[in-house]
Amino acid sequence: MLTISLGCNAAVQPDRTRIVFNANDKATSLRIENQSDKLPYLAYSWIENEKGEKSDALLVALPPIQRLEPKATSQVRVVKQASTTQLPGDRETLFFYNMREIPPAPDKSSDHAILQVAIQSRIKLFWRPAALRKKAGEKVELQLQVSQQGNQLTLKNPTAYYLTIAYLGRNEKGVLPGFKTVMVAPFSTVNTNTGSYSGSQFYLGYMDDYGALRMTTLNCSGQCRLQAVEAK
């Protein structure tokens, strides 16, 4: 089985790259689409906790399995359970929504060997407590605290939200060699390496609630400072 994070090579794809589940809601929905114009597929959905353990004790994906005809669309609802009241109320909790596409069985009358690959899409699902309410246009990601020592950046997240840093480069033309996306949990700290680049000027990009990449400039001449880059 092949697991991918965005479903880019899958016949059946979700309509987003992340889900924010507000605790005041009973459920949240996403749309899935069978992009094949020839074959029907089954779509098998489930939820995993932060450790990657399958569980429906807190959140349930419904229906767990459904059939999509060629070029058809459908919905998956993620429904909260009563036990979600046990989740922390002062910070987000991370889950994963998983969807595995199941192709139709090959034609047994064919003389040709057929390799079937079950592709699995996996996207982040953030449970957001009722006490956490972002104001319109609020950019909590700019509260990220950064310090530099040589070719290492320390990223400290003082907020109650998960911060996903998906871009780090000298400019907007490409990431630093070897850089991989970093997710900083609420009230935690992680380190990332800048490789052979030891300068103090960076472009740093984070993912917003809708999965869009938002760019900032990072100036570490003295104390590191983040500043949003206005969209062109």
Residue map of PLM features:
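Intrinsically disordered, low-complexity Pro/Gly/Ser/Thr-rich segments with frequent PxxP/GP/PP motifs
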Residues: 52-85, 174-201
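Solvent-exposed coil/turn segments that connect beta secondary-structure elements
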Residues: 35, 48-50, 73, 79-83, ...
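N-terminal signal peptide c-region/cleavage motif recognized by signal peptidases
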Residues: 5-7
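Terminal connector regions
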Residues: 83-132, 136, 199-232
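A mid-sequence, solvent-exposed acidic-amphipathic segment
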Residues: 136-172
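Short acidic, flexible loop segments centered on an aromatic residue
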Residues: 36-53, 158-175
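Buried hydrophobic-core signal for structured, non-transmembrane domains
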Residues: 28-34, 78, 95-100, 152-157
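Beta-sheet-dominated interaction scaffolds and their linkers
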Residues: 10-33, 134-148
